[in-house]
């Protein structure tokens, strides 16, 4: 099975988390955390910053590692490294996605997430309610 390794940015602003809706491909209209494939020689942090510049025309800081998700899609195996991030600039422009939302933890289940991203939602629910540093609450 084909292997794909990607990075995903869980961008937080206050108590909200950024979600983007795919505008292309087999999973068009499904929601995901922005990010993409790592290029040869890139660290996950470098790949995240590049992908967010490409997809959203903004700059982020990569604050803390959250989790790595392994998921088997019908056509490939996905390894997704997820990081808590914050915006360094306020302006966002959707270059590849058709829509975006800032969601609270309670609103995370209101959109149709890609299957691999659902595993990230589970991790996010384990974070301390008011912690901005990504520290965990009770074990999942």
Q: Where do the model's predicted regions map?
A:
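A conserved beta-turn-beta hairpin within the catalytic core of GNAT-like acetyltransferases
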Residues: 26-30
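The catalytic Nudix box helix
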Residues: 33-65, 104
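Active-site-adjacent beta-strand/loop module that shapes the phosphate/pyrophosphate-binding cleft
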Residues: 59, 69-91, 99-101
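Charged phosphate-binding loop/patch that engages nucleotide di/tri-phosphates or the phosphate backbone
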Residues: 116-140
């Amino acid at each position: 099975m084909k292997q794909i390794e990607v990075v995903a940015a869980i961008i937080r602003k206050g108590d909200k988390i950024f979600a983007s809706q795919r505008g292309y491909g087999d999973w068009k209209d499904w929601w995901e955390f922005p990010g993409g494939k790592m290029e040869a020689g890139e660290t996950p942090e470098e790949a995240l910053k590049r992908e967010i510049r490409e997809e959203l025309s903004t700059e982020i800081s990569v604050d803390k590692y959250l989790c790595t998700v392994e998921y088997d899609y019908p056509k490939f195996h996905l390894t997704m490294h997820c990081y808590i991030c914050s915006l360094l600039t306020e302006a966002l422009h959707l270059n590849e996605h058709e829509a975006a939302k800032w969601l609270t933890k309670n609103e995370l289940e209101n959109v149709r997430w890609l299957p691999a991203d659902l595993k990230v939602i589970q991790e996010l629910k384990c974070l301390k309610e008011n912690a901005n540093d990504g520290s965990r609450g009770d074990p999942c």
